[in-house]
Amino acid sequence: MEEHPRAWIISVGNELLIGRTINTNAAWLGSRLTLLGFEVERVVTVPDRVEDIAEEVGRALGRARVVITTGGLGPTYDDVTLQGVAMALGRGLKLHPGALEMVRRFYSKRGLGLTEDRVKMAMLPDGAEPLENPVGAAPGAVVEARGSLVASLPGVPSEMEAMFEKALRPLLEEIAPPGAVVECGIAVVGVPESSLAPYIKEASRVSPRVYVKSHPQGSEIGKPLVRVRVLARASTLEEARAEALKALEKVRRGVEELGGSISEEDSC
């Protein structure tokens, strides 16, 4: 596909690495960023360790237009994501009045005051601006550095999604490439992925703006089930949809020739 602005997702949390928590945030963000027109180039998971966070953020700076971290924004000792971001930027942490007001307001509504641990959530990398958390206590942060927009979001999925949609998405739309992205697909029954492969390859050659991927769900032999997803980019929604449908038609022809059937369809 044509080159688009790159995005990196850096997930922070020991609980992700030891398998205690499934990283649904990365999948959710990957989908949203792709539909905005960014090319998600890398998803990395690191422990709650300042040096590891700084290393990955530092690698992303200048290489990815958008760098999003998730997790590690809370009040506890192991919430160190913003320290890692600050280290990568070569900056210190600074108490941000706007972020502090967000934290104060959250706890005030619950009849609670500020403590040292709660104030910690308002310490942002120097030069960063807070992202309001519509659901929880910890603000996010966003900063431009070395050609990259670095945004830090909470790890709790409901908080992360709300902050992305309300606070970060408008910023991303300003730097997203022009055009439209369409994603759709079909579920193919009775055809092994290996038999379908030549048709998928043919579909992917419809246009450099089209990406076709097969996902086998059943066994290769016996009762094969293959989901085929098509992602198309174009200058308008209509053009993107037309490209996607053209690619899907190649796959449909293959299904028919191979004696299979389509059990589900996700329209473009």
Curated annotation (Swiss-Prot):
The record's annotation in InterPro entries points to: CinA (IPR050101), CinA_Arc (IPR023055), MoaB/Mog-like_dom_sf (IPR036425), MoaB/Mog_dom (IPR001453)
| Xref: Gene3D superfamilies | MoaB/Mog-like domain
Q: Which SUPFAM superfamilies match?
A: Molybdenum cofactor biosynthesis proteins (SSF53218)
SMART domains listed in its UniProt record: MoCF_biosynth
Under Pfam families, the record lists: MoCF_biosynth (PF00994)
HAMAP family, from UniProt?
CinA_A (MF_00226_A)
Q: Tell me the protein family, please.
A: Belongs to the CinA family.
According to UniProt, the name of this protein is: Protein APE_1980.1
Q: Which organism is it from?
A: Aeropyrum pernix (strain ATCC 700893 / DSM 11879 / JCM 9820 / NBRC 100138 / K1)
